[in-house]
């Protein structure tokens, strides 16, 4: 509970003793909302209360709503492989080489435009409050419109571009407000929210595959548009700020000087490299499984195992960032994903071994982004240390996550065409051991190398570069 008075102008923004800089630190230390909007004048003093940080029903309802918005918004583009398989084999889209562009636009644009959308929402708080509903409506309209498509180009615009823009508008308030609701448990909170994608990645492809097989893509898209509206609209009520607008008006979201600090640039390099390799197993694991004798259902199980393991891994990694230095967390992710790729996928010629790899990869590679809260803390600390508290007070740490998303988006977009180069002509086939000799050897090796390199910040931190 927080109380503010006109004499002390104090707002409790985080638990006492929490040294993590947040975007909620106000100029002149704190801000007092106008009496007519947030306070009650009693004996010449203005008092108002705020919900508690790191707990209480409001915080947990907010986190639960964010979990499901994350799952429903990101789960659909992460399940695009089901649509890609359907579009490739059914008219009027069969045989088109542009079908993968739909999924690339849906996911890539959502990653790339997050800092822009977050910045606009920070500048216009009233727009931010209504954004979950506005974005949801745009997503549903885009899905409904895509059900009338007669060519791939129309699908790219509707199911790809418009859906991505709507998804970003709906999702970004979750990132902006999370910093207000959680302080000591911030890493855990982000980890729980981001684990929603893994859960959706497990269940949604199964549901969509059944609907596509029974009803076709037009009816499936309309059903999902209605389901998305019904499931998500009630959640929008709980996605709300903890603080009054007056407490955050000083923040300058497009003050991006942090992106030029050495700490952030080194983290961004490792983050982008990880993004280059991270998405490749999601594209090729089912195909690889079929190449070693798996059935179509067993092949689909590979992605389901990765997503289920990622759900657990995100929550665990988020909690670890609250207790360990971020570079240690990133090294744990890199070591597990790299060794799993080289030793398990690299020598997997049987389905059980491949399943073990899927679980290991999901546990370690999937939660890499859950460590972003630690990067945010690292960068915010450097901004305060080297530029002074007053100089960095209007800096918005949540934009660190936004710019990191851009780096991951670049990796996502580049990984598509890059993967085609890596498997073209089935290199190393019959010339190497295990999985390396199946024609997917360069792809496996590249995935492993990028996974290991994503932990380079652990070394850079130890040698004093950051």
Predicted regions and their residues:
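Intrinsically disordered, low-complexity terminal tails of fungal membrane proteins
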Residues: 1-56, 384-388, 465-466
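Hydrophobic core of transmembrane alpha-helices in multi-pass small-molecule transporters
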Residues: 65-67, 71, 139-143, 152-169, ...
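Extracytoplasmic gate region of multi-pass secondary transporters
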Residues: 72-87, 261-328, 369, 373, ...
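Intracellular juxtamembrane helix-capping segments at the cytosolic ends
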Residues: 87, 160, 167-182, 189-190, ...
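Conserved MFS/SLC helix-loop-helix module at the cytosolic interface between two early adjacent transmembrane helices
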Residues: 112-154, 321
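C-terminal ends and interior cores of transmembrane alpha-helices
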Residues: 137-150, 236, 335-349
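Helix-loop-helix hairpin linking two adjacent transmembrane segments in secondary transporters
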Residues: 184-188, 192-243
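C-terminal transmembrane helical hairpin of 12-TM major facilitator-type secondary transporters
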Residues: 307-310, 321-378, 387, 391
């Amino acid at each position: 509970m927080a109380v503010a008075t006109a004499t002390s102008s104090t707002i409790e923004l985080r638990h006492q003793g929490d040294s993590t800089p947040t975007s909620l630190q106000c100029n002149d230390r704190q801000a007092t909302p106008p009496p007519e909007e947030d306070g009650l004048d009693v004996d010449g003093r203005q008092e108002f209360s705020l919900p508690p940080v790191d707990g209480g029903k409001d915080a947990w309802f907010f986190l639960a709503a964010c979990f499901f918005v994350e799952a429903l918004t990101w789960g659909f583009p992460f399940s695009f492989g089901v649509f890609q398989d359907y579009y490739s084999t059914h008219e009027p889209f069969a045989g088109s080489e542009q079908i993968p562009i739909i999924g690339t636009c849906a996911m890539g644009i959502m990653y790339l435009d997050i800092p822009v959308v977050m910045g606009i929402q920070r500048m216009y708080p009233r727009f931010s409050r209504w954004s979950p509903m506005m974005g949801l409506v745009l997503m549903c309209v885009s899905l409904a419109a895509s059900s009338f498509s007669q060519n791939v180009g129309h699908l790219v615009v509707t199911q790809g571009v418009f859906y991505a823009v709507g998804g970003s508008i709906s999702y970004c308030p979750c990132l902006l407000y999370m910093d207000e609701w959680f302080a000591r448990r911030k890493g855990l909170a982000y980890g729980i929210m981001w684990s929603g994608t893994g859960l959706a990645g497990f269940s949604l492809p199964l549901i969509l595959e059944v609907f596509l097989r029974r009803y076709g893509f037009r009816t499936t898209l309309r059903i999902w548009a209605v389901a998305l509206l019904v499931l998500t609209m009630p959640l929008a009520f709980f996605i709300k700020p903890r603080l009054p607008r007056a407490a955050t008006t000083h923040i300058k979201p497009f003050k991006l000087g942090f992106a030029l600090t050495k700490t952030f640039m080194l983290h961004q390099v490792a983050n982008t490299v990880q993004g280059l390799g991270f998405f490749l197993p999601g594209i090729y694991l089912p195909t690889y499984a079929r190449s070693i004798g798996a059935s179509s259902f067993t092949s689909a199980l590979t992605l389901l195992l990765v997503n289920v393991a990622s759900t657990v891994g995100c929550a665990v990694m988020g909690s670890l960032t609250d207790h360990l230095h971020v570079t240690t967390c990133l090294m744990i992710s890199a070591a597990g994903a790299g060794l799993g790729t080289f030793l398990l996928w690299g020598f997997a010629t049987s389905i059980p071994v491949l399943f073990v790899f899927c679980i290991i990869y999901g546990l370690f590679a999937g939660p890499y982004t859950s460590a972003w809260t630690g990067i945010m803390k690292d960068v915010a600390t450097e901004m305060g240390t080297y530029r002074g508290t007053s100089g960095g007070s209007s800096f918005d740490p949540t934009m660190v996550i936004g710019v990191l998303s851009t780096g991951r988006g670049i990796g996502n977009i580049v990984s598509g065409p890059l993967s085609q180069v890596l498997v073209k002509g089935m290199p190393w086939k019959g010339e190497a051991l295990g999985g390396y000799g199946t024609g997917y050897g360069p792809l496996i090796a590249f995935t492993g190398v990028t996974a290991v390199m994503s932990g380079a910040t652990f070394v850079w931190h130890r040698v004093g570069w950051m």
